[in-house]
């Protein structure tokens, strides 16, 4: 696994990681209506572009797949941290947090 900075072409994979993480990893703790509100299936790419624009975003990749991503502001405060469920509990979030801390 490797970390790198987000590029605009990564947006579809980042959106998919977010959606899948919310609907899989958070599913035991929230009602479906809450999950759909938090991560709607018809999320708009333009809204995501606006959301990420003021932030620094990094990715962890594994064999060309986005395993997770983190977005943080200029003060280093995390705003978003999500891991693809296929890579859960494999140290992805730890790697991303270490990048942000350094």
What are the roles of these predicted feature ranges?
Residues 5-9, 16-86, 94-99:
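Acetyl-CoA-dependent GNAT
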Residues 91:
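Glycine-rich phosphate-binding loop
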Residues 102:
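Conserved GNAT acetyl-CoA-binding A-motif
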């Amino acid at each position: 696994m490797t970390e790198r900075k987000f590029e605009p072409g990564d947006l579809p994979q980042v959106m998919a990681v977010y959606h899948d993480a919310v609907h899989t990893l958070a599913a035991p703790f929230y009602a479906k209506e809450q999950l759909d509100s938090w991560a709607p299936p018809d999320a708009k790419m333009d809204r995501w572009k606006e959301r990420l624009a003021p932030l620094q975003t990094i990715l962890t990749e594994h064999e060309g797949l986005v395993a997770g991503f983190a977005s943080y502001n200029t003060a280093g405060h995390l705003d978003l941290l999500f891991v693809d469920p296929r890579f859960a509990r494999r140290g992805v979030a730890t790697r991303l947090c270490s990048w942000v801390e350094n």
